[in-house]
Amino acid sequence: MHAKHWIVACALALSGSWSALAQTISSPNKGLQLHFSMTKEGAPMYRLSFADGQEIIRPSHLGLEMKDAQKSFDKGLEVTDTKESTFDETWKPVWGEVKEIRNHYNELLVTLKKKSNGDPIAIRFRLFDDGLGFRYEFPGGKDRNFYVVKRELTEFAMTGDHKAHWIPGDYDTEEYDYVHSRLSEV
């Protein structure tokens, strides 16, 4: 193989590896950006920023500690697949203050597996014009339908003591008014 071909082959291989390790998606209006990456130890991380680069959530770890420590999804993971998609629908609520609600987001689905035993987990990110949502998913399988989560390791490294809009909860009711306060007051 000629040196020129070797350099091109290496560049292509490295660019493919990099895209599997770090990925960015934008909200539909391009105002927000989600950055997903993996550490050298195989730990998934994310951060959220405005389009101009100003961070909202600093780099934060993702993961789940399982009852069986060998099955924990916090490090020793590798990306096996990523898929991007867009969803846009308008629906009409039965009651409420608005007649129509638009559900519009860009999605990044990252599938990971444990290097030690091959157990899979997926993280589904949905980036809206006004925020981010994500969840962990356990792809089904013959012997992969029962997990015991000991502790969630998800981090939210906020860049400051921002304003929060939240509703308190209790064991016997969810009928409370929304509270507007600083994160430190939640």
Predicted stretch roles:
Residues 8-17:
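Bacterial N-terminal signal peptides
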Residues 1-3:
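N-terminal secretory signal peptides that target proteins for export/translocation
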Residues 24-186:
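N-terminal accessory beta-strand-rich subdomains and adjacent acidic, glycine-rich linkers
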Residues 5, 23:
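Functionally constrained cores in energy, signaling, and assembly domains
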